[in-house]
């Protein structure tokens, strides 16, 4: 019997599946998942983890050992398998002058759930494999339409929703990456000014692995009436991860983070949210609750959570922000 089938009942990680025998996923507790680390070395220090984690995220070396070393080992096997398939296909086609395109990992999940921390931790771990792969990290924030466009289209209150992104630009970027093109530009975003930075780009030059992180990366698109092929962002992924948590927990993390930002980033006069630094705690709490209820909760329910079943791996967090359950798609 596999470890996955030893779990009593099915976790709430995928509550729409009634039995693991009918689920496309294997389920593991964090303790069971930790055993898959095997002899994977810990290549991060405690200080490095503190530097990589986002505000309010308590991830530490113990969490890296429990969850991320096993995940690093799993991803290593996928990357190696991808390389083997690439070599076999080249032999089949009698091609010898072809360079393998980047292995792309997509990371999705709600605002405030910890996607950025996961992405940064993975970037460091993967880059320290014995093979020393080149790993780049890009977020979808830079692919938001500029505020001027959102204001003109009356979409500022829909920022983060699918229509607020330049999906065409995302698809062109990923197409160029998967085509193996050099020096591909990714637009930059500033959380300080809450806007895309004009004429500022990050250059992605043929990495071995690209981590692409954002709330919308697993979303599907409606098929056009004319029947033309419409690519989805996830079509370019070799592996995808969804960071999951109970709705109430994400709500609490979002509000807590907002209140902490009032004491830090919002105090910068250049901050888009500087006006919130001088209001009372009660007023700030009311604003945070309103932003959660009318924007982020709606986006989670309508657009983000429905994409969860499309992920290859689901990491379910508990109330302490630490991962409690893992679901891995069956092959």
UniProtKB/Swiss-Prot annotation:
InterPro entries: P-loop_NTPase, PanK, PRK/URK. Pathway: Cofactor biosynthesis; coenzyme A biosynthesis; CoA from (R)-pantothenate: step 1/5. The keyword Transferase applies. Keywords: ATP-binding, Coenzyme A biosynthesis, Cytoplasm, Kinase, Nucleotide-binding, Transferase. Its main location: cytoplasm. GO terms for biological process: coenzyme A biosynthetic process. Pfam families: PRK (PF00485). It catalyses: (R)-pantothenate + ATP = (R)-4'-phosphopantothenate + ADP + H(+). One of its GO terms (molecular function) is pantothenate kinase activity. ATP binds at residues 109-116. Its EC number is 2.7.1.33. It is found in: Cytoplasm. The keyword Cell membrane does not apply. GO terms for cellular component: cytoplasm. SUPFAM superfamilies: P-loop containing nucleoside triphosphate hydrolases. PANTHER family: URIDINE KINASE. NCBIfam families: panK_bact. HAMAP family: Pantothen_kinase_1 (MF_00215). Belongs to the prokaryotic pantothenate kinase family. This is Pantothenate kinase. It comes from Rhizobium etli (strain ATCC 51251 / DSM 11541 / JCM 21823 / NBRC 15573 / CFN 42).
